[in-house]
Amino acid sequence: MNQLFTKTLMSAAIACSLCNTANAQLSSNPDKFLGNITTSWNNDMDTDGFIFSDYWNQVTPENATKWGSVEGTRGKYNWGGADKAFNYAKEHGFLFKFHTFAWGSQFPNWLRNLTPEERYEAIVEWMDAAKEHFPELPIIDVVNEAVSGHQNDTPLIKEALGGDGKTGYDWIIKAFEMAHERWPDAILIYNDFNTFQWNTDEFIDLVKTIRDAGAPIDAYGCQSHDMLSYDGKNVAPTFKSSMDKMHQELMMPMYSTEYDVGTEDDELQLKAYKEQIPYMWEADYCAGITLWGWIYGSTWTTDGNSGLIKNKVERPALTWLREYMQTDAAKNAKSPFPGMVKEASVYVKPAAIGVESGKVLPITVNASLKTKTIDHIDLFVNDELIGTLTNAPYEAEYTPTAEGKYDIKAIVTATDGTQFERLSGFKVYPARTPYNGEKEIPGIIEAEDFDGGAELFSFHDSDNKNEGDIKDYRKDAGGVDFVKGNGGCAIGYTATGEWLEYTINVKGAGIYSYEATVSCGSGDGSAFSIDVIKDDDLVNLCKVNVTQTDNNQWSTYKVMSGEFKVPLEAGKQIIRITIDKPYVNLDKIELKLEGTGIQSVKGDGLSDDQPLYNLYGMKVDKNFKGIIIKNGQKELNK
């Protein structure tokens, strides 16, 4: 199989122990769990005389491990509810899941008052506190609901962890790296909703991108709240096709993390359970199912109607679920994590997920085994063996010669013959091409003339459609939006996280000032950052806060000015403009070498009939090298 898996089970003693503790529960499968959540804010495990451990063999606190619940006051941690669930799981011998670390909702209110740097420190402190309190965690929802549009406050977390970056999801990768550093043996999950309907493709793109970039993600979590049709009258029509698509695209372990069917109609709920639970449970890449509540009236859905016990009576779906879990198909269903634990941590990390044709791409395989020993790793690119790696660090190089998508596969072989697989990938692009030539600095950068290349290579847009009113300016710009503005062409319909890169040639090193010609009709204003790329890292030059230029109109352009906080070096380099706050139209940015007033650089093209002067007011000819004054403006003639 093309997924992370092990061909051998845990020791008989561990497996037997799990079976013995699960005898009273609905599932007796030793390799995948059927779990549930704590009920209500009081974290009840047993409700109305019904005992949690009689039904379920995994627990997720509904709220007790969310940041806002734990650290309402900075530096003061309330672990009471989390401890109750953790100790209950430990007492009964089943799994406890930590939910969740990075989420654009239910974080402490005091986080809003911090700078991005201070927010980052707060996140580090939060994760360190969790590590100190729970030194060992078996399974974690690391990042929750980060698909674009799912949580309005996601940018608060995103900005603190480094933003979109080169992959579009650098901040998520950072969160997973932080979790893996603290809990290397934990199963690390990305969790989101609307994965079976409405946002399947967006979910796949996010998970696949961070996987390909080498994030230590072990599984994807489908919340599974979207199990009925939009009108709530039928079972979700795209459930099976979406589940198949996610597996085919990702080839990773999957969890159903928050399954519920919210309806008062017993027959509709039963129908959904019958169609959906076996399809997930019997998939050998599905590692477990967690139901999101079980007592009617005590779940998050309308009137708590997803509950399975109503008026102290089991609803038909629960009666059926009990019967199904006793079938051979349910008992013997395979899992990507035998024994419900992670044996292998294998993550393939190419130096970049986008590379120019003909350039060397370093590839690293970060691999470790919990109880076994690695013998060797076979590394493939598009099914071609490029190396057999026997010693850590496990590194190789590959030079692509053609454009397109490339698949990477690492097969880790242990000394006992057990094998584990991990996929990754990268794209090969044509060489970066400065559009309308390199931008000489001091000088003007027209926003629409960003470098040619490809999406996530020389630019990034949140969709693949040009929604502007200029359709024919460029054909190599993906979904970047070109609009009429300020008498010419501008970039419009900007969204947070989008970016554009420009190749510049700096003629004079030093601190530069900027004059950005922009428009913004939003009363909240907008913002963007300018960074220079050094050794594949972004070095911030400035953040431009854009005030409203006209009320709900984007036709009025004004100049926002300021100064870079670090100097530019002389020579060729790449700068990036990143949208930090949406709804700004970008026309152009003029860069001047501070302290000189130089507004542009001229290499040739000066004519004899142009009056030219040096800084002392003396007339010079076109052959003079240095700072000249032409038409009242300073230029550097080289």
What is each stretch, according to the model?
Residues 71, 129, 141, 145-165, ...:
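Aromatic-rich peripheral "rim/lid" segments of glycoside hydrolase catalytic domains that contact
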Residues 40-53, 121-130, 199-210, 272-277:
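Short, acidic/polar
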Residues 36-47, 67-80, 107, 147-151, ...:
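Acidic-and-aromatic substrate-binding clefts and catalytic sites of carbohydrate-active enzymes
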Residues 80, 85-90, 95, 165-188, ...:
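Glycoside hydrolase catalytic-domain groove-lining segments
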Residues 375-382, 595-638:
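C-terminal outer-membrane/trafficking sorting elements
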Residues 25-58, 62:
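Boundary/entry segment of secreted carbohydrate-active catalytic domains
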Residues 54-72, 80-195, 263-265:
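Substrate-binding cleft and catalytic face of glycoside hydrolase catalytic domains
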Residues 339-390, 397, 401-594:
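Extracytoplasmic
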